[in-house]
Amino acid sequence: MAASLWMGDLEPYMDENFISRAFATMGETVMSVKIIRNRLTGIPAGYCFVEFADLATAEKCLHKINGKPLPGATPAKRFKLNYATYGKQPDNSPEYSLFVGDLTPDVDDGMLYEFFVKVYPSCRGGKVVLDQTGVSKGYGFVKFTDELEQKRALTECQGAVGLGCKPVRLSVAIPKASRVKPVEYSQMYSYSYNQYYQQYQNYYAQWGYDQNTGSYSYSYPQYGYTQSTMQTYEEVGDDALEDPAPQLDVTEANKEFMEQSEELYDALMDCHWQPLDTVSSEIPAMM
């Protein structure tokens, strides 16, 4: 039975032939591509549905090429794929996530997924977080549909080797209460990994990750895992993922503060209070 994947972040010039060729370049054969367009303007909506021969082929393709560079794309883009719920009820089954830290730059989504799914069949997917240039930030997330397998993975794979060049560091990700807000149709299919708030502030310092250079130091104590294993996240699209320990841009912060201060001053000067002509001027009576 045929199965489809949702593909997003498309440019207007990316038509059915372009998408089919891109998958063929990656060694995947698609049955058809359906570009979704605005009903009123006819302009492409920025996403499509790609049909495969069966569910197994679609799943293999998702985990193999999701997040990899999109051949022929200008400007450079990456495959942004997800399971399609086109014409179906969305899957509301619970998910249990793990934060995976200390990933080396060679680890991609497919490698992260394969590392866990071969032992834990309920692993639904893996996501390595990238910066704006497409370089790994050194951490990612994996999702499970079985809570027991999530807990087993946390215990059994803590410090495990075989994923990249360093032992992996794991912690539990607990979802906060979801905010109810309207979303556009295309956003329903976004590959929704989550924004995580680190409960420990010195993650990169202890594990030897340099945020400025994206490089790793191997001088940290082996298995010195003293932080809390609990981390929380709030569900947002994967494009909104943030660095767990961002650096403060002092110059930009000062500039923003001064602009806000000037706006407040101008607002006060423009209100109904008028300056006195001279020091000896009388204060007008209240109307």
Curated annotation (Swiss-Prot):
Record protein name field: tRNA selenocysteine 1-associated protein 1
Keywords from the named record: Cytoplasm, Nucleus, Protein biosynthesis, Repeat, RNA-binding
Principal location listed in the UniProt entry: nucleus
Domain RRM: 3-86, 96-175
Keyword field contains Plastid: no
UniProt cross-references to PROSITE patterns, sorted A to Z: RRM
Family: Belongs to the RRM TRSPAP family.
Summary of the function given for this chain in its UniProt record: Involved in the early steps of selenocysteine biosynthesis and tRNA(Sec) charging to the later steps resulting in the cotranslational incorporation of selenocysteine into selenoproteins. Stabilizes the SECISBP2, EEFSEC and tRNA(Sec) complex. May be involved in the methylation of tRNA(Sec). Enhances efficiency of selenoproteins synthesis.
SMART domains registered for this protein in UniProt: RRM (SM00360)
Statement: the UniProt record of this protein carries the keyword Protein biosynthesis: yes
Signal peptide from the UniProt entry: none
Subunit structure: Component of the tRNA(Sec) complex composed at least of EEFSEC, SECISBP2, SEPHS1, SEPSECS, TRNAU1AP and tRNA(Sec). Associates with mRNP and/or polysomes. Found in a complex with tRNA(Sec). Interacts with SEPSECS.
Tissue: Ubiquitous.
BP GO annotations: selenocysteine incorporation
